[in-house]
Amino acid sequence: LREHPEDAVQRQWDIMNHNATAARKLVQRVGSLPPERRMVRLGSEMLQGYTEANWIKWWQQPEIQRHCENIFAPVGEMARRLDVKVSFHPGQFCVLSSVTEDIRKRSIEEFEYHADMARWMGFGKSFQDGCKINVHISGKLGPQGILDALPKLSPEARNLITIENDEMGWGLDASLELEKHLALVMDIHHHWIRDEEYIEANDDRVKRVIDSWRGQRPSMHYSYSR
């Protein structure tokens, strides 16, 4: 960036335009699948360096923000037209329940980056309106850490956040402590690994997870071991 700033900026323009176009094509492809399979996870690397110190000011320029809205809006429009649920999953370093204040602050910034993309697509105006931003509880503060973070998030981020049970850390029972505050995502494989239990469809906990979506179509994950 310091040695070739013009080349770096042009590369950013090229990458953001390419990734937005690719996302629209991906949503279009998923929209051709059977209704129960119409969910797509978009990558966190769509906009390079969005929360990185050297690039934050560049990304926050009004003209850049307007351009992002223009290129992401068609992605959301197509998702709604084809009834495709959009999903983001911030990486492992997004730890809203960390005991370290600086990590919590940077985690909120990272979460809001995903909320910005969802907002440009037209999502986040109401609770779980077609896009989710999914994280694990992760940090040592546990469910209470998530509750403490919620008021610090933008309205769109609060509408779209989901919490998924982890296979090593905070499990399904911890997630259920948040069922009245946000939507929950149950990963069957994570639960099987952590709790050594295959959860049945008629289990009351499954109903509670579904009810946390407040009438919206819920999402469920079935991960696999690496």
Question: Locations of the language-model features?
Answer:
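Eukaryote-skewed repeat-based solenoidal scaffolds used as protein-protein interaction platforms
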Residues: 104-184, 189
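Alpha/beta catalytic barrel-like cores
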Residues: 1-85, 94-108, 116, 121-127, ...
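Active-site-proximal loop/turn and secondary-structure-junction residues that shape catalytic pockets
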Residues: 44-48, 90-94, 137-141, 165-169, ...
